[in-house]
Amino acid sequence: MTENIHKHRILILDFGSQYTQLVARRVRELGVYCELWAWDVTEAQIRDFNPSGIILSGGPESTTEENSPRAPQYVFEAGVPIFGVCYGMQTMAMQLGGHVEASNEREFGYAQVEVVNDSALVRGIEDALTADGKPLLDVWMSHGDKVTAIPSDFVTVASTESCPFAIMANEEKRFYGVQFHPEVTHTRQGMRMLERFVRDICQCEALWTPAKIIDDAVARIREQVGDDKVILGLSGGVDSSVTAMLLHRAIGKNLTCVFVDNGLLRLNEAEQVLDMFGDHFGLNIVHVPAEDRFLSALAGENDPEAKRKIIGRVFVEVFDEEALKLEDVKWLAQGTIYPDVIESAASATGKAHVIKSHHNVGGLPKEMKMGLVEPLKELFKDEVREIGLELGLPYDMLYRHPFPGPGLGVRVLGEVKKEYCDLLRRADAIFIEELRKADLYDKVSQAFTVFLPVRSVGVMGDGRKYDWVVSLRAVETIDFMTAHWAHLPYDFLGRVSNRIINEVNGISRVVYDISGKPPATIEWE
């Protein structure tokens, strides 16, 4: 019998902050399971979840507005510790008898708070000391409203000149509120505060570790599918690869992976996937060469959204045909991860249980009555990668830059042709190879090459020629919501350009994209 790794759990109520998923990831990093629910949960749902503690997230609303979100009153009656972050502190203060006002001074960015009273939350935690020996904490503020009076049974723990109640606490009830964001790295001791709350105040054990997550997933897969057969669409991406490895460990040859080679993959990618999963790890793989079918369907199409839909539709058709050839398959496995679940949850349901169709499978034929197996649906992307390493997948594969679902279909601008894909594959491979050689690959968040459907004049030997243009793209980003173009060294860019033009016959010009996001997107289509 495997250990119950969900025994100690934290509930995070989401009030809409851009950092809320980061709070959940930080709690997981502390080795404790947590779930992220919309703020409007019911008492019954909270009772059923039985949390060891509750975190109230930040949010963009103003608690001074009449219809702004409120924590369910039961939260404060559940008898468990509560940690309010920014908006979460404000709604806690207001709901428990304090007062919140819109502030004339919006506090955004770095601040230093002075600890004025002892509290279990920050005891022994400091970045510096005042002249008279009081602890100082470097924190990241982001708020317009501020608490102007705390509930009568709370004490002020820390303050700034413009924020008199930067931390408040009721030690007896184990209720804490902070007017800053402990989950971001700019709050230097933020992780220690979260650890203090989760591990010490809530008394949660560190049960959520890669090895234990794998044991738990394997046990749950075996319990769910028994001796039945399972089918999985294997793309070679992180999510489907880790799903394949977990299922293989759990059910062995009862798993069949269908690898659809659509002709839109990176250089030698199909061979690498088949070698690694088939030959090295011994998975049962059905290889479907379908390049001609995809390219025929894409012929003449220039619109990016239409191309995406065509690629998705043809994938589903090919996958369905292969699935129907297999006998007695009862289950479809998908690489759904926790952010997919969160994104798809309707806030009215409170709990994130509505799961969207994963981009790489789609609808199955009506005659195929199959159950769904989603072994990664509780995991964030960084956790999936850690699980992959534990299962023996190579680091370079797990930490590769993101690759779009439609593949080169959206990196060849306009109509997609085999000639264009072949040129792009080779140019992109040179760019990535040089990034790795220069130790720059892991210093940028994403790098790739784009094929431009324009011919440009070039000089080769004594003659002129008109050949194609490619653009190099490299960005630096934390969350992929905004991004800066990467300032790669000129000599490096020159080396890449020379290699592509000399080694890839058919390309005469290389340009570098220096657009940020916004206004541009990271991908060109």
Swiss-Prot record:
Pathway: Purine metabolism; GMP biosynthesis; GMP from XMP (L-Gln route): step 1/1. Residues 9-207 form the Glutamine amidotransferase type-1 domain. Residues 208-400 form the GMPS ATP-PPase domain. Its EC number is 6.3.5.2. It comes from the Bacteria. Catalyzes the synthesis of GMP from XMP. This is GMP synthase [glutamine-hydrolyzing]. The lineage of its organism: Bacteria, Pseudomonadati, Pseudomonadota, Gammaproteobacteria, Enterobacterales.
